[in-house]
Amino acid sequence: MGTWWALAITAVFFGAAHLGNPQATVFGAVAIALEAGILLGACYLLTRRLWLAIGVHAAWNFVQGGIFGSDISGTGSGRGLIEARFTGPDLLTGGAMGIEASVVAVVLCTAAGVAMLLAVRRRGLVVPPCWRRPPQATLDGTQPA
């Protein structure tokens, strides 16, 4: 499948998984697919381990809900250490879906994800799709037909 297809597919699934949340919107799911799907996927691609992606996701949710007390992906939050109230257009605040459904988060998190993807490419960690890979020798050392 290759790196880029795997990243795109998992980002779409990550965004779609948030459609079941209360207060979810299609724009919110697309925003999450872009920002978090790319950023968290890039975390994995850079380290080839899930721990960084899990840590970034957990830190995002903790800071958003546990510190600022704001909505997390449309699920509400409870009380944080600080009572933050975002006012303004939903496009800038994310509305009831939370700040991750805002254009601000999309731009900042996608930019961070793209920066990490550039590092992935620079380090030679991109795997091409199977139809673009050179044929490999079989177990007996011969080339496949």
Language model feature labels by segment:
Residues 1-144:
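Transmembrane helix-loop-helix hairpins at the membrane interface
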